[in-house]
């Protein structure tokens, strides 16, 4: 085996993530925060909200007990979030939701 100094260093594009092996290289909390900002972009618009999203917003703020972390809240409401992004054709948010679902949930 050659010296480690002569081995090719892995670049981010070379690294594949697998949460069943390790969470190294997976930014679940960071991606969840970004995803929450995408959610709020829609549900904070009075034209796009409803009673469920009012409840979700209150829950996210800790209004119904302890404040859950973003990842838990996303995991618990994955289908509703997917439906929201599909309804408003938010492909960027859907792509990140897929990443979070596969890597973190």
From Swiss-Prot:
Keywords: Nitrogen fixation
Annotated protein name in UniProt: N(2)-fixation sustaining protein CowN
Origin: domain of life: Bacteria
GO biological process, one term: nitrogen fixation
InterPro entries: CowN
Family affiliation: Belongs to the CowN family.
Function: Is required to sustain N(2)-dependent growth in the presence of low levels of carbon monoxide (CO). Probably acts by protecting the N(2) fixation ability of the nitrogenase complex, which is inactivated in the presence of CO.
